[in-house]
Each structure stands twice: as C-alpha cells, then as structure tokens.
A protein has these predicted regions:
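Electrostatic, structured charged patches in enzyme active sites and in nucleic-acid/phosphate-binding
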Residues: 1-244
Length: 244
C-alpha cells in the first residue's frame, strides 16, 4: 500500500466540529495517548449510530474495515476497562474493540500499529500475565481474544477506500428520513431482476441522487443488497445487486 493511495492519505476532508458532549471524550483520548504522538480520529459510525474518538491510525483503519463488513452484526470501539481476578490479584485490562459477528461468535480485539518484539526477560512475566488477563476478560464476553496489527488491514485497502466514500454520503444524510427511498431502491432492484448500475439506480428512483446513494449504502450495511466494495473502487458504474 503506497503512502499516496493509503486510506489515511485519502482522508483529507474536514468533518463537523465536535459537540460539547464529545469534548470530554477528546480530552480523555488525549490523555490516553500519554507520550505517544498518535493521531486522534473523531469518527461517526452510521452503522451503530454514534460517535467515537479513536486514539490511533490502526484503530481508524480497523473502523473503516468493520463499518461495512457484511459478516459483522455490531461492534463497540471503546469498551469499558475491566477488572479480572488473576493469581489472587485484581488486574485492570481493556480491549480496543469488541466485534459481534452474524454467525454468533465474538472477537475481543487488541489493536497495535505493528508486531511487538519479544519482551525483555524482566518484562516476560508482566506480558504473560497481561495476555492471560485478556483471555479471561474475553471469555466473560463469550468470545476470544484477537490481536491485530496494521498489516492485517492491507488486504482490505479497497474496502477502506470505499468506506471513506460511503461514509461521506451517510454522514451528510444522517438526519434525513430515507425509509421511502430505501423502499424505492428495493422495488427497482426487484423489478430489474439483475444488477443495476448505481447511477442508473439513482436516476430510476428519482429525487436527490446523494440521498439515493446514502439509502443504498444503508441497505448495504443491513445486508439488503450487495456492492463490489472489496474488488473495485465504487463509482456510478458499480453494479448494485440483490443481497447474497
């Protein structure tokens, strides 16, 4: 993935200023960074319907991957820290994300920029205890502990790029009632009986094309239709099909 074409390089647009409700989260996120000079990302998930403040680029790329993943039911990008009892001591631990899949399994994820080298001998016990605490906390959620690094997201370069495009439409239309537009999209696809180009679909439905696009992307998140978000850059020529 080149620096020029990476999702981070493409994220140049300015979003809305954070509301007073988010200021506390922003200040807390600044504190969480400690001495690490990582980026802060104020994001809105149209899928979950809430804002989050993410404390690093890896967390942001992870969000772009999960926001439109058809296999995911829901996710929490800022789970509360937990206290687990381990070897007769209380240990505080936390995850960067908890992801629930449609097939019922759960992943409690820790996100790192890159793989860490083996700990020094004096740190090995601490690292082992921390990993054990993560495993215990994950079992509380009925899930498994998963560690991911930025390189894990490279195969999803197109999905992340397309997520940025789709999120701009969803953010612009988040206060619009799109139920009737979604119904019109579904009716048009049923009548067609075959995949329809995105721009042709918008023309058939009528009204504001940007709202039709937003309705299509909402339906994608709900698995009510399909788009080739992992295999090509989405444009007006992209084919919208029935759900798989």
């Amino acid at each position: 993935m080149s620096a020029e074409s990476s999702p981070l390089a493409l994220a140049k647009g300015r979003g809305p200023a954070p509301s007073s409700k988010l200021r506390k989260a922003v200040f807390e996120a600044c504190g969480q960074r400690a001495e690490h000079a990582s980026n802060l990302w104020l994001i809105y998930s149209a899928r979950i319907g809430r804002n989050w403040v993410l404390t690093g680029d890896t967390e942001y790329l992870h969000f772009l991957c999960v926001e439109f993943d058809p296999e995911i039911e829901s996710f929490d990008l800022k789970p509360q820290p937990e206290i687990v009892r381990l070897r007769e001591e209380d240990r505080k631990t936390s995850f960067d994300a908890i992801v629930r899949f449609r097939d019922g399994h759960i992943e409690c994820r820790e996100l790192k920029r890159e793989s860490e080298p083996p700990p020094e001998p004096e740190e090995q016990l601490r690292a082992a205890l921390q990993a054990e605490a993560q495993e215990i906390a994950a079992k509380r959620h009925g899930g498994r502990y998963v560690r991911m690094v930025m390189a894990d997201f490279e195969p999803f370069h197109l999905r992340m790029q397309n997520s940025l495009r789709m999120l701009r439409f969803l953010l612009a239309a988040k206060d619009e009632p799109l139920g009737e537009v979604r119904n019109a999209v579904a009716l048009t696809l049923r009548r067609s009986g075959a995949p329809v180009r995105l721009d042709a679909l918008a023309a058939s439905v009528g009204g504001v094309a940007a709202f039709v696009y937003a309705a299509v992307f909402q339906m994608l998140q709900r698995r009510q239709l399909s788009l080739p978000m992992d295999t090509e850059v989405l444009t007006g020529n992209s084919l919208v099909g029935s759900s798989k």
